Design a protein with these regions (language model features):
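Canonical Radical SAM [4Fe-4S] cluster-binding loop centered on the CxxxCxxC motif
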Residues: 32-77
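Active-site donor-binding loop signature of nucleotide-sugar glycosyltransferases
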Residues: 25-28, 64, 149
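Flexible, acidic/Gly-rich N-terminal and inter-domain linker regions that tether
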Residues: 1-42, 57
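Generic detector of short, locally flexible boundary/turn motifs and exposed helical patches
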Residues: 6-11, 59-62, 86-89, 109-113
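Residue-level recognition of conserved structural "scaffold" positions that shape functional pockets
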Residues: 17, 51, 104-106
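Radical SAM/AdoMet-radical enzyme domain recognition
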Residues: 76-96, 104-206
Length: 206
């Protein structure tokens, strides 16, 4: 358990590192309206994407422009500056950017450092070309992982088996696995059908 007391806005929090449960209570009888420092940080460590046109080929545009952007990845040193400033105040860091965080060349060091400073790392990935080593690192260090859903029903079959395989591998390894499903006018009907038919892979958390 991590206990955080916000002296400015007069409340305290208790965060369970094992399951992500957060309790917040006021001290002075007034509901807190904000926090002195974010409890969760979204940190874009990826400057470009290894997947190329993978998302677009699945009919989904990348909001990070990963298919046209080629910037350098965030350095481990710069990431550590963020972690050190957040230590003791931030409970979780969501790793992202213009690509899959598990493909960052120093992802193991990044995940280990988060845990060393008692910050829980999480990430979203396409699952494209995910390796057994990456699955193991996610299982060991991450609170949860979300897989971007890049598969559609076509003639009663999944259009992208790689997405299905990635979800199933993460679930089988014991990772808390969620699905990142982009709902739009083109996907809403299929999303409803999938929920009604319970057609997502078994064992996903949310």
């Amino acid at each position: 358990m991590i206990i955080y007391k916000d002296e400015v806005f007069g409340f305290f929090e208790i965060f369970n590192e094992e399951n992500g449960t957060l309790f917040r209570s006021d001290i002075n009888g007034v509901d807190p309206v904000m926090r002195s420092f974010p409890e969760l940080l979204d940190v874009g460590i990826m400057g470009h994407c290894n997947g190329g046109q993978y998302c677009r080929n699945a009919g989904i545009d990348c909001y990070q422009k990963g298919f046209t952007t080629y910037a350098p990845h965030m350095s481990y040193e710069n990431f550590m500056e963020i972690v050190k400033q957040a230590a003791g105040k931030t409970f979780q860091i969501a790793l992202g950017g213009a690509g899959d965080p598990n493909k960052h060349p120093q992802i193991e060091d990044i995940l280990k450092s988060c845990r060393a400073y008692r910050i829980i790392p999480n990430m979203t990935t396409s699952g494209f070309l995910i390796t057994d080593n990456e699955v193991g690192l996610i299982k060991q260090y991450c609170g949860a992982v979300a897989v971007s859903w890049y598969s559609r029903f076509m003639d009663g079959k999944e259009s992208n088996q790689e997405t299905i395989d990635a979800v199933e591998r993460l679930v089988k390894s014991g990772c808390t696995t969620n699905i990142h499903y982009v709902v739009s006018k083109d996907t809403i009907n299929e999303a409803i059908t999938r929920l009604e038919m319970d057609s997502f892979p078994k064992g996903v958390n949310a």
